[in-house]
Amino acid sequence: MNLRPIARSLLMAAGLCVPGLQAGAGAPAIKRPVVVELYTSQGCSSCLPADALLAKLTKRPDVLPLSLSVTYWDMLGWKDTLASENNTRRQKAYAATMGHGAVYTPQMIVDGTTDVVGSREGQVLSAIDARARDGDTDFVPVAVHETKDELHIGVGASQDRGAVPATVWLFHIKGQATVAIGGGENDGRTMTYHNVVGDLRAVGQWKGDPLTIDLPRAGLEGLPHDSVAVVVQRGGYGHVVGAAMLPHPDFAPER
């Protein structure tokens, strides 16, 4: 399938706490970004180095970093202003898929396959490098752009005809959010978070053949974001085979 022309898009084919967007422009078109998800919390003091590392990763054109704040540390006395149950459920789904007995923060999940303590920069960077090499063998082209009435998502064909079906995820991202924290382990700090996931949803299933998904813009307006990202992921929470980001679509709220 020939995808429609891409307008204003990036086409990229290509201690712990344990409880009881900016993807840069200019990446080569034959590559895709490595998706890095940070599970974090405003109530977790151990998360601060991981939050800082994620901010650094937003400067890399070969990485699509996402910050997902979870809810389970709200019990420490500060309700995380960026957290959502969707984020918490996603992390728990990863834990079940990976066979982990518990969730924790800060956790970075690299391309849906590798679980790394988010504050261990060397391990995180090594995991990114490994997926950048391995991902060249199984990537699927993904494009996202907007038209007058729709958000258009295009997913290309797989070379592996026996590939496991994949979920197409849509992430709504706020590039930066500054928060004055008034309780919990980080009481008194003012933190700036980057590539904050304000909403996420599954918008389709990809089974190896070219796929087009058109979402009405009317249903996207007013959501807490200034960018959107599309991630194509084996099963629901398996390895990532494609991703793309659309910064500052017209339907995003005024910044």
Task: Name each model-derived stretch.
Residues D111:
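Conserved residues at the C-terminal ends of beta-strands
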Residues M1-L11:
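Bacterial N-terminal signal peptides that target proteins for export
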Residues A14, P49-A55, F171-A177:
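Short N-terminal helix-initiation segments at or just after the protein's N-terminus
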Residues G24-Y104:
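Active-site-proximal cofactor/substrate-binding loop regions of enzyme domains
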Residues K79-G101, T114, G118-R255:
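Short, conserved sequence motifs used for protein processing/export or organelle targeting and
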Residues S9-P19:
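Bacterial N-terminal signal peptides
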